């Protein structure tokens, strides 16, 4: 008996609920039918044709999809919040079961033809015709999503440590300011739901309303709202993949001068570095904006690296040529000997060149001034001159002449060898100097290219 009564109560409640739903649906159906019965969506929603429609526009930035530096296009995911009053879509909630808000298809009512003026590659107008929210006062709120591809002039002077000021210019396409007025919802776009980008950081963003007078109709204003977005690039990707490899190429170029010339691999290493750098530049050239308005910082640095490597190859050729010089083809000038053999080694604190002793006493044989030490290989102190009749012996004289010839030939070879060693020593000194100079230029060049811009960014905060 008790179970039966519970069943009846539940059935009654279900019937009342269904009746409420049916009545609510009937009220909404009747309301929509009455509102749209004689509605003309072509005519502006004003009480008198001299009045204007006041539209409030708010831009909600959801995502910065991409920034195409080459084609200078910024792709964004946005929502355009538009509000206005349609005087023909008002009702008394008491006549329709207390309904205060309804949702209507946007295709069934008048819509402002708001477009993106600086569109670059895409749709000028909104293409996703979502439903709009209408309340009993005639106030309409429509927030359609859109993917905008806007033109943005990319200033590449400080790339990749650059800031870009990109704009979105929104305006009514067919109505002038006397027919449809637009005003920004706020002086800043809404970034409350913005998804952070891995490449860009929003530094500042603002919106301004403009009255524009064209030459065709100088007395009629056309209104637009322009949003400015100041974006700063996160340079980590380019630092790791471009700047650091170029810096390593520069250091590797300097190490060419640390490699001994006798190894025969100095030129091989130089050419290998040049080829590697060329291939590397061909790969990364597509990452750099192709514009002739300015040379970006990273382009200057790559040009510096290329000149640096080519200069090292030219100088390496000179060093190798110096290393292989001989006294038969090149006589060392006295100033070269004084600077590169006597002075610079002492200044740079590396070992000086060892030279053969010139304190050799000359020992004469008979009247022909033959050095006894050249013949016997031993130093003889004092001048020993033989004054014997053996000088008249032809065999002895012939033997002495032969020994003298051999001694002079050995002396000539020794002088030639010493001269060649001097050239090699000069080449080694030049290598040491160039190693220090190139490493210093590498560091100074890198700092001079990027330091100024990095200081500016640090001061801006």
UniProtKB/Swiss-Prot annotation:
Q: What is the annotated role of this protein in its UniProt record?
A: Upon acetylcholine binding, the AChR responds by an extensive change in conformation that affects all subunits and leads to opening of an ion-conducting channel across the plasma membrane.
Q: Which residues are glycosylated?
A: 165
Task: List all disulphide bridges recorded for this chain.
Answer: 152-166, 216-217
This protein's assembly is summarised as:
Pentamer of two alpha chains, and one each of the beta, delta, and gamma chains.
A single GO molecular function, which one? acetylcholine-gated monoatomic cation-selective channel activity
Instruction: List the InterPro entries.
Output: Neur_chan_lig-bd, Neur_chan_lig-bd_sf, Neur_channel, Neuro-gated_channel_TM_sf, Neuro_actylchol_rec, Neurotrans-gated_channel_TM, Neurotransmitter_ion_chnl_CS, Nicotinic_acetylcholine_rcpt
Please give the family membership noted in the entry.
Belongs to the ligand-gated ion channel (TC 1.A.9) family. Acetylcholine receptor (TC 1.A.9.1) subfamily. Alpha-1/CHRNA1 sub-subfamily.
What is this protein called in UniProt? Acetylcholine receptor subunit alpha
Q: Which CDD domains match?
A: LGIC_ECD_nAChR_A1 (cd19014), LGIC_TM_nAChR (cd19064)
Q: Where in the cell is it found?
A: Postsynaptic cell membrane; Cell membrane
Give one Pfam family, short name only.
Answer: Neur_chan_LBD
Instruction: Write down the PROSITE patterns for this protein, in alphabetical order.
Output: NEUROTR_ION_CHANNEL (PS00236)
Q: Which organism is it from?
A: Tetronarce californica (Pacific electric ray)
What membrane topology is annotated for this entry? Multi-pass membrane protein
Residue ranges crossing the lipid bilayer per the database entry: 235-259, 267-285, 301-320, 433-451
Topological domains, Extracellular: 25-234
- Annotated catalysed reactions: K(+)(in) = K(+)(out); Na(+)(in) = Na(+)(out)
């Amino acid at each position: 008996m008790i179970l039966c009564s519970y069943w009846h109560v539940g059935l009654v409640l279900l019937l009342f609920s269904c009746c409420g739903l049916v009545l609510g649906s009937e009220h909404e159906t009747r309301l929509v039918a009455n509102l749209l019965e004689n509605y003309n969506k072509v005519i502006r929603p004003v009480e008198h044709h001299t009045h204007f429609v006041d539209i409030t526009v708010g831009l909600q930035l959801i995502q910065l999809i991409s920034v195409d530096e080459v084609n200078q296009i910024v792709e964004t995911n946005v929502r355009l919040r538009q509000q206005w009053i349609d005087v023909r879509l008002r009702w008394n909630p008491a006549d329709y079961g207390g309904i205060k808000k309804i949702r209507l298809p946007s295709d069934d009512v008048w819509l402002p033809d708001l477009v993106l003026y600086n569109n670059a590659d895409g749709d000028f107008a909104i293409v996703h015709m979502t439903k709009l929210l209408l309340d009993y006062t005639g106030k309409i709120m429509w927030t359609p999503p859109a993917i905008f591809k806007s033109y943005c002039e990319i200033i590449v002077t400080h790339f990749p440590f650059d800031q870009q000021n990109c704009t979105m210019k929104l305006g009514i396409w067919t109505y002038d300011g006397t027919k449809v007025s637009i005003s920004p919802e706020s002086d800043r776009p809404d970034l409350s739901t913005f998804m952070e980008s891995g490449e860009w950081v929003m530094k500042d963003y603002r919106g301004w309303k403009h009255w524009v007078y064209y030459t065709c109709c100088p007395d009629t204003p056309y209104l637009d709202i322009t949003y400015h977005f100041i974006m700063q690039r996160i340079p980590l990707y380019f630092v790791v993949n471009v700047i650091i490899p170029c810096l390593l190429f520069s250091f590797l170029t300097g190490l060419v001068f640390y490699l001994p010339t006798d190894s025969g691999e100095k030129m091989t290493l130089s050419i290998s570095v040049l080829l590697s750098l060329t291939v590397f530049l061909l790969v990364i050239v597509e990452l750099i904006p192709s514009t002739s308005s300015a040379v970006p910082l990273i382009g200057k640095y790559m040009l510096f690296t290329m000149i640096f490597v080519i200069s090292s190859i030219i100088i390496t050729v000179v060093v190798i040529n110096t290393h292989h010089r001989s006294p038969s083809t090149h006589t060392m000038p006295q100033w070269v000997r004084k600077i590169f053999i006597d002075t610079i080694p002492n200044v740079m604190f590396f070992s000086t060149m060892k030279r053969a002793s010139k304190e050799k006493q000359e020992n004469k044989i008979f009247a022909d001034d033959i050095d006894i030490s050249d013949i016997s290989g031993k130093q003889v102190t004092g001048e020993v001159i033989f004054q014997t009749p053996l000088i008249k012996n032809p065999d002895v004289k012939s033997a002495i002449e032969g020994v003298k010839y051999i001694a002079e030939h050995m002396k000539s070879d020794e002088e030639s060898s010493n001269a060649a060693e001097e050239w090699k020593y000069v080449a080694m000194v030049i290598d040491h100097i160039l190693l220090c100079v190139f490493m210093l230029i590498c560091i100074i060049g890198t700092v001079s290219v990027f330091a100024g811009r990095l200081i500016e960014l640090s001061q801006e905060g």
